């Protein structure tokens, strides 16, 4: 029998976007071909898809690291890079996805249900897409964004109409095998059932599913015994059935005390339910009681004795013997009636309306705050500035100048000045820290001296070609003047 795994922690990493291309069109008789660098391809995303043929999370137990392919780099001649293919990961029906903080992200129920667990990164723009009046042939391109990386917890919660709950060795597995074609492991020792067993039951022309889950002991809601491994698998059941062993020889146990103990555990577990439980709390689900093993004479007498007392709670009571196959048909049709009545009483599920929240006009999309780790420094946070920094190649001066222009147009520099930032102070955006120089890019017109360079970022102490030429002209002028003076002196 394959190993059953119903809870795993995985690491999902989506593909990164491809880098844009910085190239210039070269063709005979076309000296000004212009930029033709293509955009990078989008990175592949990781998508969970419910597959009815998958029944366990075992594959994730042995392969917890999942990564999607990255996008390809853009190329010249306006050729965009290929997008990375989305990675579709098959998960069982009833899988719950939680983030690293335990917050519910998705409840995957129903064949074909999809959920994007990690989004692929955007591809970087090529220099053809970055061309403008100021930059007719940009000597740079934007880098692709890294794909989303997440640590996720997957939990499997059995999807069944009826959940059988009871103490160990109460006969739950025997009952499932008697009313369905399921063949769970059956033995005469406690905790024989370690994994949920599902069976399909026919009630005339109708069918429903029954789940036999691991046995319950007092304190299961706090983790004793199989604890949450038991209780997790009954959250989705529409009807809960207490299977009571009327032939038990354990001292201090009787059908009434067993039912009270089971109900106490259900009540204690209900506040821990995560997310939206469409069927309501466990304490509100319909109940039925199966008094099992009445083929034993003493057990039959005990079942008859407590039957009326249990029925006073408003729960149907069924006397059953799986060995003699007695009372099975009334139980099957009684459960189907409870399921149909409960489901018909549930309100119709209305699809959630899409809520659009417009961004205010005066929302700049960033925030500047003092850096608590370093006096006099500042931290700029916001989706756009941080994305722009990730897309910038800091080995290219022209790309850095383009980033400075974008930040200035967004209003970052103006906000830094308002907060009292001084030239040379450290400014952190995302993972990068800069020495802020307001006179470098602030509102100055773009002056390009060559592809991949920005005159505003050149060091002022470096002597340029024009300065060297002027110095040589001055030296020649000085030499000529000195030579003329000497000649006049000799003639005199």
From Swiss-Prot:
Domain Obg: 2-159
Binding-site positions, Mg(2+): 173, 193
EC assignment: 3.6.5.-
UniProt key word Magnesium: yes
Binding-site list for GTP: 166-173, 191-195, 212-215, 292-295, 321-323
Domain OCT: 358-438
Location (main, coarse): cytoplasm
GO MF term list: GTP binding; GTPase activity; magnesium ion binding
Region (Disordered): 449-492
Cofactor: Mg(2+)
Subunit structure of this chain's protein: Monomer.
Protein's recorded name: GTPase Obg
Organism, scientific name: Mycobacterium avium (strain 104)
GN (gene name): obg
């Amino acid at each position: 029998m394959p190993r059953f795994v119903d809870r795993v922690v995985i690491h999902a990493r989506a593909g990164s976007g491809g880098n844009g291309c910085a190239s210039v069109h070269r063709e005979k008789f076309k000296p000004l071909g212009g930029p033709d660098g293509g955009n990078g391809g989008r990175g592949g995303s990781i998508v969970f898809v419910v597959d009815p043929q998958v029944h366990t999370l075992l594959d994730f137990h042995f392969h917890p690291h999942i990564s999607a392919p990255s996008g390809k780099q853009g190329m010249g001649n306006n050729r965009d890079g290929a997008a990375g293919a989305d990675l579709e990961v098959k998960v069982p029906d009833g899988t719950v996805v939680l983030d690293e903080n335990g917050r519910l992200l998705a409840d995957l129920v129903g064949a074909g249900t999809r959920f994007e667990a990690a989004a692929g990164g955007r591809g970087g723009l090529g220099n053809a897409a970055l061309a403008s009046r100021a930059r007719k042939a940009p000597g740079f391109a934007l880098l692709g964004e890294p794909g989303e990386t997440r640590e996720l917890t997957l939990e499997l919660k059995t999807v069944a109409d009826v959940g059988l709950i009871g103490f160990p060795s109460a006969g739950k597995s025997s009952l499932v095998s008697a009313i369905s074609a399921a063949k769970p492991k059956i033995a005469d020792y406690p905790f024989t059932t370690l994994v949920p067993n599902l069976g399909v039951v026919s009630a005339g022309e109708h069918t429903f599913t029954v789940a036999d889950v691991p046995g319950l002991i007092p304190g299961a809601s706090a983790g004793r015994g199989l604890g949450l491994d038991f209780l997790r698998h009954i959250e989705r059941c529409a009807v809960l059935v207490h299977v009571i062993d009327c032939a038990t020889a354990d001292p201090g146990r009787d059908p009434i005390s067993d039912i009270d103990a089971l109900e106490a555990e259900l009540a204690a577990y209900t506040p821990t339910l995560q997310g939206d439980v469409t069927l309501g709390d466990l304490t509100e689900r319909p109940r039925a009681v199966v008094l099992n093993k009445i083929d034993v004479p003493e057990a039959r007498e005990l079942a008859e004795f407590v039957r009326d007392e249990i029925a006073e709670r408003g729960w149907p009571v069924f006397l059953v013997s799986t060995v003699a196959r007695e009372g099975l048909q009334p139980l099957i049709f009684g459960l189907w009636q409870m399921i149909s009545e409960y489901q018909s009483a549930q309100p119709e599920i209305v699809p959630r309306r899409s809520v659009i929240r417009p961004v205010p006009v005066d929302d700049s999309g960033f925030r500047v705050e003092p850096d608590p780790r370093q006096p006099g420094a500042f931290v700029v946070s916001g989706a756009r500035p941080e994305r722009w920094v990730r897309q910038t190649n800091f080995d290219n001066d022209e790309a850095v100048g383009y980033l400075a222009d974008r930040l200035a147009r967004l209003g970052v520099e103006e906000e830094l000045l308002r907060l009292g930032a001084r030239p040379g102070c450290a400014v952190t955006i995302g993972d990068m820290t800069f020495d802020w120089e307001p006179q470098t890019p602030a509102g100055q017109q773009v002056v390009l001296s060559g592809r991949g360079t920005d005159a505003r970022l050149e060091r002022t102490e470096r002597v340029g070609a024009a300065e060297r030429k002027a110095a040589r002209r001055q030296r020649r002028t000085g030499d000529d003047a000195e030579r003329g003076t000497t000649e006049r002196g000799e003639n005199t």
